[in-house]
């Protein structure tokens, strides 16, 4: 029986070699090995260690990954075993993430009060400017109304002329005289308003630039301190699908995929951009936290801060000082964000 089985295998090998001259058992083994190595390299360079941990510990996540990647059972098992060997690397990166969270906490506790003071000073000054713009505008409107009313004297004088035996002509003459003066006053008031508004806009622009610099510095430091933490902001299910599609492409093309994905070392700028929607970071992170089965309060704090900073920068971009009301509204929204950041700072300080 054993001899018959060996004979069948021998016949199959001859048939395969005749129909596929370049194929050998050793060649297929090397090809699978090369594919596994490429996938391992891909995971090391582009996949978050936390995401890898979820894939290795969640049967549902792994089955979905295998299904989307269209991996045969044998290749999937081999890849799983190879990825398990990366767990020390995952542990190291988890420790690194905890260190960066602690680094962020220490830095934020120390530096934020000074940043808050500078931004608050800008907010208060912007409100003063808004009040001054409104006051000047109101005064100029009153001046224009007064100058316009003097023209009524001339109109009344012409209308009353047939009935007043010329008496109304004196009214008209007075109106003309006042009209000349009021026209000059109207022009002057417009010049005053335009000049002051331009000056106020320049001052507001400088204040905006100052607080923007503070916020951008805060954002850049956050990006530098918390790249691993920011990878949490990506939707886990969608990211799994992206990884599986790239692995599928690797398997079919036998070539390394070049397009960037969820790089945990090189966090793309648009990761921070996606945090603008209020509530989204917390929702996504808690979803990942459920998969991990552990609390991620430190991550939530960092993402809340990043979200508020980015939102505040967006407010800066929209502030053009076109009116006192728009300045007040912008200052109010910025202050609300600053208050939330202050609350986070107080919570961290309380431990």
From Swiss-Prot:
The keyword Protease does not apply. It holds the Pfam family ApoL. Keywords: Lipid transport, Secreted, Signal, Transport. It is found in: Secreted. GO terms for biological process: lipid metabolic process; lipid transport; lipoprotein metabolic process. Residues 1-21 form the signal peptide. One of its GO terms (cellular component) is intracellular membrane-bounded organelle. Widely expressed; the highest levels are in spinal cord, placenta, adrenal gland; also detected in spleen, bone marrow, uterus, trachea, mammary gland and testis; levels are low in brain, heart and pancreas. It comes from the Eukaryota. GO terms for molecular function: lipid binding. InterPro entries: ApoL. May play a role in lipid exchange and transport throughout the body. May participate in reverse cholesterol transport from peripheral cells to the liver. Belongs to the apolipoprotein L family. This is Apolipoprotein L4.
């Amino acid at each position: 029986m054993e001899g018959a089985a060996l004979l069948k295998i021998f016949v199959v090998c001859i048939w395969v070699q005749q129909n596929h001259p370049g194929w050998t058992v050793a060649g297929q083994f090397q090809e699978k090995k090369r594919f596994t190595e490429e996938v391992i390299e891909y995971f090391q360079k582009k996949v978050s260690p936390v995401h890898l941990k979820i894939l290795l510990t969640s049967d549902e996540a792994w089955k979905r990954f295998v299904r989307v990647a269209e991996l045969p059972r044998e290749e999937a098992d081999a890849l799983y075993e190879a990825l398990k060997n990366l767990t020390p690397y995952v542990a190291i990166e988890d420790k690194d993430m905890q260190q960066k969270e602690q680094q962020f906490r220490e830095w934020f506790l120390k530096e934020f009060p000074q940043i808050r003071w500078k931004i608050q000073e800008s907010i208060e000054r912007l409100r003063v400017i808004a009040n001054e713009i409104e006051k000047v505008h109101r005064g100029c409107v009153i001046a224009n109304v007064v100058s316009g009313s003097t023209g009524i004297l001339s109109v009344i004088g012409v209308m009353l002329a047939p009935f007043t035996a010329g008496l109304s002509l004196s009214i008209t003459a007075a109106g003309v005289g006042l009209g000349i003066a009021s026209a000059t006053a109207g022009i002057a008031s417009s010049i005053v308003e335009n000049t002051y508004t331009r000056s106020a806009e320049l001052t507001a622009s400088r204040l905006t630039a100052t607080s923007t610099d503070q916020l951008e510095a805060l954002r850049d430091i956050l990006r530098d301190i918390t790249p691993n933490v920011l990878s949490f902001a990506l939707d886990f299910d969608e990211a799994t699908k992206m990884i599986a599609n790239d692995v599928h492409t690797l398997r079919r093309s036998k070539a390394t995929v070049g397009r960037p994905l969820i790089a945990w070392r090189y966090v793309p700028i648009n990761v921070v951009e996606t945090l603008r929607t209020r509530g989204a970071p917390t929702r996504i992170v808690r979803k990942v936290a459920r998969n991990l089965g552990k609390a991620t309060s430190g991550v939530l704090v960092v993402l809340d801060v990043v979200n508020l900073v980015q939102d505040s920068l967006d407010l800066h971009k929209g502030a053009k000082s076109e009116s006192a009301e728009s300045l007040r509204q912008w200052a109010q929204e910025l202050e609300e964000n600053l208050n939330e950041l202050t609350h986070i700072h107080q919570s961290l300080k309380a431990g």
